[in-house]
């Protein structure tokens, strides 16, 4: 017979101490500093910031260190800390067209105003292990030059000017805030994009991949992917004008998708949109693909795949919520299991007795 297993504070404290010891590792080796994580594991920091909802590289690096490199645990830590922060102001909408570019590519036009800029990327590597890194080699040297950045309008604005795509218009409405108001379905576009930005990268990547394999009407081209620094401004009440409070490294992706032919409009391309912190390019692309898939009802398209089901996609995208629900199965369920056990034994006795 199953009985309750008793534990206590001492056992829990010992478990935490053991975890801290494993996190530190061999104390004969130098401890990994938060600054090293921030600078040298920058893509992991970008993901934790994006899905954790705080644009603070030091805090994201600290969370990664505390979580022993577990991204989901680090995201959980950052989300928990976020709930303790006061909301001091709301920033002005960012203008990504004025981004100080680090990288900009387009898969639909070779020559675009402002040009293409490869920037930092793993795209053209051979994916072979670099064993020289085991020797703690020298810092890579870069040649430095000064260049003027030409105006770099969005590729979608060029399509819109030709009547090939609809221009996005600011309605002036206040965006939803999913940190203050729980999402409901169907939800607004602003709520959807916020949930996708905070959604798990692997989950969104799988859904985006599914749209390319026929589970949803989606034939995309990467109209533009741009990464760089964006100015952040707020308007203090006592001043009444915008004040620059810093800049953020962000990545934006716009996917141009198959065209539609509405009755009262000219046929035009549709778009999917993604925007994330840092250089999380894969996440931005997946977000843009899923965003377009979720627009299926807006265009009267048949729902043919899971990526087009808004409630299914968004209700399961949050890895903190998902990990919490799955992890709760580790908690004691002795009474529940005892009930199942007694029922099973009774059914076996009834079958044995005919």
Model regions: which residues?
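Acidic, serine/proline-rich low-complexity intrinsically disordered regions
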Residues: 143-354
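Short, amphipathic alpha-helical interaction segments embedded in low-complexity terminal/linker regions
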Residues: 1-227, 241-243, 349-354
């Amino acid at each position: 017979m199953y009985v309750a297993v008793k534990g206590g504070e001492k056992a829990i404290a010992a478990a935490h101490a053991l975890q801290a010891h494993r996190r530190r590792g061999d104390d004969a080796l130098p401890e990994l500093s938060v600054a090293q994580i921030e600078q040298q594991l920058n893509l992991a920091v970008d993901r934790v910031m994006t899905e954790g909802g705080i644009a603070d590289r030091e805090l994201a690096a600290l969370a990664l260190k505390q979580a022993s490199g577990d991204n989901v645990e680090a995201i959980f830590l950052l989300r928990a800390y976020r709930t303790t922060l006061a909301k001091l102001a709301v920033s002005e909408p960012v203008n990504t067209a004025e981004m100080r570019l680090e990288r900009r590519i387009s898969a639909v036009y070779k020559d675009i105003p402002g040009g293409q800029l490869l920037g930092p990327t793993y795209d053209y590597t051979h994916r072979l292990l670099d064993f020289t890194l085991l020797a703690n080699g020298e810092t890579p040297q870069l040649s430095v030059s000064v260049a003027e950045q030409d105006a770099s309008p969005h590729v979608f604005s060029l399509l819109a000017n030709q009547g090939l795509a609809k221009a996005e218009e600011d309605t002036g409405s206040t965006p939803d805030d999913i940190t203050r108001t729980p999402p409901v379905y169907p939800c607004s576009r602003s709520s959807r994009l916020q949930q996708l930005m905070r959604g798990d990268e692997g989950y969104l990547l799988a859904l985006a991949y599914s749209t390319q394999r026929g589970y949803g009407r989606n034939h995309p081209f990467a109209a533009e992917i741009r990464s760089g620094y964006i100015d952040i401004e707020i308007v203090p009440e006592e001043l009444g004008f915008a004040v620059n409070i810093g800049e953020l490294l962000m990545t934006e992706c716009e996917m141009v998708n198959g065209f539609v032919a509405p009755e009262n409009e000219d046929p035009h391309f549709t778009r999917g949109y993604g925007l994330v912190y840092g250089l999380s390019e894969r996440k931005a692309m997946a977000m843009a693909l899923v965003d377009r898939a979720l627009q299926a009802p807006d265009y009267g398209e048949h729902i043919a795949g899971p990526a087009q089901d808004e409630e299914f996609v968004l209700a399961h995208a949050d890895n903190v919520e998902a990990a919490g629900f799955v992890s709760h199965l580790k908690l004691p369920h002795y009474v529940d299991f005892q009930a199942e056990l007694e029922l099973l034994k009774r059914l076996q006795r009834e079958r044995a007795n005919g």
